[in-house]
Amino acid sequence: MENRDLKMAEKIAACVADKGGRTFLVGGYVRDLLMGKHSKDIDIEIHGVQPKELENILDGLGSRTEMGASFGVYGLRGYDIDIAMPRQEEATGRGHKDFKIYVDPFLGTYKAAMRRDFTINAMMQDVLTGEIIDHFGGQEDLKKGVLRHVNPHTFAEDPLRVLRAAQFAARFSFSIAPETIELSRTMDLTTLAHERVMSELEKALLKAAHPSIFFEQMHKMNQLDDWFLHLTQLIGVKQPKKYHPEGDVWNHTMQVLDSAALLRSKAENPLGFMLTAVVHDFGKIISTTEENGEIHSYDHAKKGDPLVKEFLERITNETKLIRYVRNLASLHMRPYELAREQAGKKATNQMFDSATVPYDLILFSTADQMGKGKGQVIPEYEDFLKERLDWYQYTMAQPCVMGADLIKAGLKPGPKFSEILAYSHDLHLSNVSKDEALAQTLSFAQRLA
């Protein structure tokens, strides 16, 4: 907690105490404190004073903001603190937002904590005394590394909690209690908005050391199919043992995910990089064949693109992110193929030129190799690719033929102009000098005329 925010929380607590109430730190802050982790999320809950009294207190301490005054949630401008009053929720439908909320300042800590999702998130700490209030055994579950729901009725009303269970399990390397798994199997996730699904997935992909746990736990809860069907379809898809000692495509994907997590901080687009790990072998679902005892997945990187597109468009509207992942997934086999062939500079230049982020393509090919088991990363290939990326960047920094050069030479823009520019760009990738490239391009344009 930032010291400035802590001091303000203490001021609020002191004013509330003067009115006969108590102020508690709640939720993730208390959990992280007991885990020895730093938490930027500061949530306090005010008990024992009426909403109007709390509003007067906040007005006296700063500029009050209302994040949801009708259900007792406030803030103070300039401070990163969420200030809430105890409340109860009643489901009015099947959706994540289908709830009626009732503010009750005198609900008591037990009932207030009962609405939380997991025991490790249901603990409270008195801001002034430091006393920990733990009605549901959160500290013990924290020690054991177990995620356990607090209340089966309220847990089952909110399907997002299934994803949160998998997300927390991945982030903290916790197990999920058997009774929570059983309850989660009965819940319907189809009513969730894709933004909520993506939010939990993003946390698992970017914060977990082993993001594979997210999908493994979703599978254990029988909840992969609604949002992650293509991952279920990877289970049992065979791979040649010579190249994939780790087993089927599901096992490989899980290992690539955890390998990618080791490299994601180096990627220009960490979320896109991790999503690529999820989807990169979807093409094997439709391309894998077995002939004379040999398993093949010819051209799976490109054949999988429709499945990748379908998967991504289900969970996000971010076109730039979708474009990045589709590009990286479709090219992920090329770096090691070209390195193995010791391909010429034009071939590697063309590969990098077709990549949205060339460095991330190399990085992902490394993660893919790591996902095949120990010894699959070949240092000589890595060096080859990095040297060729340097060469590509050098090539692209050289003068090249532009549209203005062609117009100056007498060409007029028309239907074939883009084809002519593409020809000149191909010469640039071949490291042909600008003068020579211009001459060859004009000759090509004459042949097209």
Where are the predicted features?
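Catalytic cores of the polymerase beta-like nucleotidyltransferase superfamily
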Residues: M1-A449
